[in-house]
Amino acid sequence: MADPAIKLFGKTIPLPELGVVDSSSSYTGFLTETQIPVRLSDSCTGDDDDEEMGDSGLGREEGDDVGDGGGESETDKKEEKDSECQEESLRNESNDVTTTTSGITEKTETTKAAKTNEESGGTACSQEGKLKKPDKILPCPRCNSMETKFCYYNNYNVNQPRHFCKKCQRYWTAGGTMRNVPVGAGRRKNKSPASHYNRHVSITSAEAMQKVARTDLQHPNGANLLTFGSDSVLCESMASGLNLVEKSLLKTQTVLQEPNEGLKITVPLNQTNEEAGTVSPLPKVPCFPGPPPTWPYAWNGVSWTILPFYPPPAYWSCPGVSPGAWNSFTWMPQPNSPSGSNPNSPTLGKHSRDENAAEPGTAFDETESLGREKSKPERCLWVPKTLRIDDPEEAAKSSIWETLGIKKDENADTFGAFRSSTKEKSSLSEGRLPGRRPELQANPAALSRSANFHESS
């Protein structure tokens, strides 16, 4: 049976036989996996074996006279060396095991120490997190009031707890600075109730101060008609700056009556053509600076805006309006404001050019006489007139045409278009339109309506 060999990369590696166990190979080769490789001492190396083999060889070469006693002594020496080598290997293994066990124990001890340190730190943190509120109440450093409360501890420094003062509504930290910003300063001011309270208090105090110096026009019923407070200084300066002409006009023209009756001013119907032809400007609405006056009634009698309109006649079937209701509207005549040319006039802005205004060069008596002559309540009013078309002849004689700037023509018939005649009916039946007035020709809609009116009549 040939010796088993392994071929590796073209080389044959011979294997030793299983039955032969060499003492030198058992100690010089590698051990099993379970064993730890141990470096043998110099006495167990193969050099000694070579020397011994060399000695034995020399001994054999010298002669065969060596007896059995010499062979036995050599085997005893080998056994002693083998035993010594085994003892040294066992000692080395025990030393390695002790070193590994000591390293493992050291690691376990360090991990245990780290765990104990972490546990101690966690307990300390839990103790710090569960800090109790201070029992001692600290006074507020701003207002020295004891109405304070503890809020919480500072996140960065536990030695600086934060407190809150209920009186001055401010926070502060013990050992730190006081916050001058009140609570809720970042919010809108109209939401904070404190600001509302302060605003109401200021208004009431201002009204209380104004009630002392007030000149009111009292109504007989006890209600205030006009109120001039202490803040309306312009009214007093205006009253002092006006001339006596305006004062006399105010006395003669303004009459305060009960609100139920109103102010009734009768205008004569038989006005001359001169008076009817002059169109007076609208009276000005009085302007009082300062707070608006308080009116006890829903109607506004002083600042009545007079509209230049012509109300419809009674037979136009306006619901809820009687024929005499249009004439019952009342107006208060207003005095003409002073001219802007007067340097003493306190009013600002544009002014109307009135004839009654006093010029700087005229004397006071002349202006007063001129004011009495020229100031008539009929000229200062805009009275709506009703033009009735029941009688065309009377309507043609009315002065409203001159007011509107339409000249009368005695030969021409103004309302001839509204009269139906037999000639026009015959011309309409023939299909021809009769001659019309220029007023109707300028307005084709009125012309068509008049034609339809004539056809229907």
UniProtKB/Swiss-Prot annotation:
GO BP terms, alphabetized: flower development; regulation of DNA-templated transcription
Residues that bind Zn(2+): C140, C143, C165, C168
Acidic residues bias spans: 45-54, 62-73
Oligomeric form and interacting partners: Interacts with ADO2 (via kelch repeats) and ADO3 (via kelch repeats).
Primary localisation category: nucleus
Protein name in UniProt: Cyclic dof factor 2
Dof-type zinc finger segments: 138-192
Tissue: Expressed in the vasculature of cotyledons and hypocotyls, leaves and roots.
Gene: CDF2
Domain of life: Eukaryota
